[in-house]
Amino acid sequence: RRTLKNGTTTACYFATIHTDSSLLLAEITDKFGQRAFVGKVCMDTNDSVPQYREITADCVQETERFVKELLEKKYPRVQPIITPRFGPSCTEDLLNALGDLAETHDLHVQSHISENEEEVKLVENMFPAYQNYTELYDKNKLLTSKTVMAHACHLSEEELKLFSLRGAAISHCPNSNFSLRSGVLNVRKVLEHNVKLGLGTDVAGGYSASMLDAIRKTMMASNSLQINKVNETGLTLEEAFQLATLGGSQALGLDDVIGNFEVGKEFDALLINTKASDSPFDLFSADDFEVIRTGLMIKKLMGDDRNISEVYVAGKQVVPFSSSV
């Protein structure tokens, strides 16, 4: 409900390590009419919270069951996605098995990579046979054109080149990166390497499930790099908006289906009310605006779910919620 009310028509969900609850999330997502990739989280290494650690063989078996049962449901817009939590929480055997599973069923893959410098060092120590974090995923068949990796704040030039070569994508999660002081992703540099990039929220790491917030934080991250003279120019608001829409669809390999209003694509849209009674910003009748463009710019900068009156997924109105959900 929260993600739909915030206007998210397509989501990538990390569920839990539990198969049945992950399947339930997929069922609920389908019932609400959202387009989504849902993943059963996999981790067989976890000293911090041992009760979350799975036995490798059981994890693989349960992931296979999750994929099989979800595919059998034949939901029109909800698909399984292979989800190793991240490198340090998985053994090499598990990563390899998950890569085989993704390859066998031609599935999408999601995980985290290079969120903070300590994580990068941990991966180097845990997997010394690999040149870098990206190679760990790549050699285990988890870095493909159907892969989306969150964060990527500390990728090297070589890793960005490998991302581009494989057609893998990055989900930029600036709210989380600021909140956890993980780092600042240089989006301009990523795009210059021809790596697909969309925006994410990393809820639990960040504090907002709103893509509007993700746009604002993306601008802040870009501005901070310009202030510190890392980049000569920052992103424009139009570029940040494109990353949240078409960029996200490209990251998920859905840009032939969604991402903009090109003829033939599915109609995903929000009806925006800039004059909502409880709007977080004010508009005045004397303001001389280019109504459509400027109103949208203000909405993106200052608005929130209170300004979203209706949400449509593939032409079907999903917000306000129907009485059946």
Residue map of PLM features:
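His/Asp/Glu-enriched, well-ordered alpha-helical/loop segment
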Residues: K139-K146, R188-F284
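Short acidic/polar active-site loop segments enriched in Thr and Asp
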Residues: T9-T10, K196
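Divalent metal-coordination and catalytic microenvironments
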Residues: G7, T29, I82, H112, ...
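A conserved active-site cap/scaffold subdomain adjacent to cofactor or substrate pockets
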Residues: E157-E158, S164-T201
